[in-house]
Amino acid sequence: MNEFRERYMSRPTTLLELLAVGLDAEPAIGAPGSTDLTHAGLRSAVAETAAALRAGGLTPADRVAIILPNGPEMAVVFLAVASTATAAPLNPGYKPEEVEFYLTDLGARALIVHDGGDSPAAEVARRLGVAVLPLRPTPEVGAGRFVLDTRALAGPPSDGLPGADDTALVLHTSGTTSRPKIVPLSQRNLAASAANIRASLALTKADRGLNIMPLFHIHGLIAAVLAPLSAGGSVVCTQGFNALRFFGQMEAARPTWYTAVPTMHQAILGRARQNAAVIAACPLRFIRSSSASLPPQVLAELEAAFGAPVVEAYGMTEAAHQMACNPLPPGARKPGSVGLAAGPRVAILDDAGEVAAPGAIGEIVIRGDNVTAGYENNPKANAEAFTNGWFR
C-alpha cells in the first residue's frame, strides 16, 4: 500500500488512485455534529456503493444523476458514483420540468435521491423509466455514511472499472444565452485538476477544509472536496452556506482553509468583527476565492479580519475548475488578477490561430490534462471552442 500511495501521490489518473493516497486512520470526510469518516472508511464506503451499482448492471458509461442536499452524503455519493460510472449531480432546487430536461438530455440510467417519500424528482424519473435509488443517511456510523437501495437497477452485473480516459462527471454549462451544453470530464481531467489545486495551495494531510460550496457545481466538487482528499487531508461538509452559521461551523470544524465565491466572502466579512474571538481561536492558513472576481477592497478587508492571505483563482467547468491561481506568500499576489497558470498550459493565440509572441495581444487559450476533450454531441460548439488543440 505504501508503494501504491507514493506512486500516485504526485499524479493520480483516476479517482480510485486519488482516494488511495490518504492514510487509513486519518480523517477524510467530516460534518457538523458527526464523527469523522477516515480515509479507510471513505474507501470502504466508495467500494461498497460502487460494487452495488455494478451489481445492478451499471458500467462506466452509464449516467447516474444525483439530487441530494449539500452535506457529507452528497460528497461520498459523488465519489462512489464517479469511481465506477458517470456522476451527474443536479441542483436540488430544480423544478420538475427542469429535472425532466436534464434527465432526458443526459440519458440518465438512474437517479439517486434522499429516502423521504416520493419527491417530485423521483416521480419524474419513474415516468421517464429512470431507476430511482433512495438513499438513507446513517450519520451514527460516521459522516457521509448511508444505505443506498439499488433494487430498481435491473442488471446484468457489470465488472468493468473505468480507465483514465473514461468519463467520470458530466455537468451542463449555464445556458444563459443558449441551450446548455454538456461538458464531459474524464477520470484524468478530475484527478489532474485536483492535483493542480493541491499544488497551488500546498495542501497536505494536515489541512482541513470547510466546504460551504454547492456540490452540484465544479468549484465545490473539485476544489473543496477532491483537492484536499488528493493530499490525504480532510473536508468538513456543511449543509450549505449560511452566514449566520459559518462561524459556529468554523469553531466546531477548526479548518485550515475554505474556498468560496465573492458573494459568500462578503457575507462572511459582514459578521467577522462580532466573531473575532472565533477567528483568533481558529486561525486559517489561507482563504481561497474563485468563480467570479473578488473586489480588491473585499480581499484586503478579509485579509485584515482573518489575518490570512486570500488567494484568488480562475476556473471554469470545461477545465475541471482551475486554470490560474495567485501564489501563496511569499509569492506576489495581485488583487483583481487571475494569477499565474496553475496546471494547464496557457497561451495567447494570434488571429491565425497560432501561438503569439511574448507581449502580443490575442486570445487566451488553454490545454492540459484537466481540460475536457469537447462538448457532448455538439460539433458546432467544439469547432468554435477548439483551435489546433487549444481550448478558447
Segments from the language model and where they lie:
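Conserved AMP-binding/adenylate-forming core of the ANL superfamily
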Residues: 7, 27-71, 75-79, 95-100, ...
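Short beta-strand->loop structural element characteristic of the AMP-binding/adenylate-forming
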Residues: 65-67, 74, 78, 82-112, ...
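Conserved AMP-binding A3 loop
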Residues: 36-40, 168-192
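Structural core segment of the AMP-binding/adenylate-forming
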Residues: 55-56, 85-161
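Conserved ATP-binding/catalytic segment of the ANL
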Residues: 341, 357-359, 365-392
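Gly/Ser/Thr-rich phosphate-binding loop
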Residues: 255-260, 269-333, 345-347, 352
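Conserved AMP-binding/adenylation subdomain of ANL enzymes
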Residues: 82, 191-208, 218-256, 267, ...
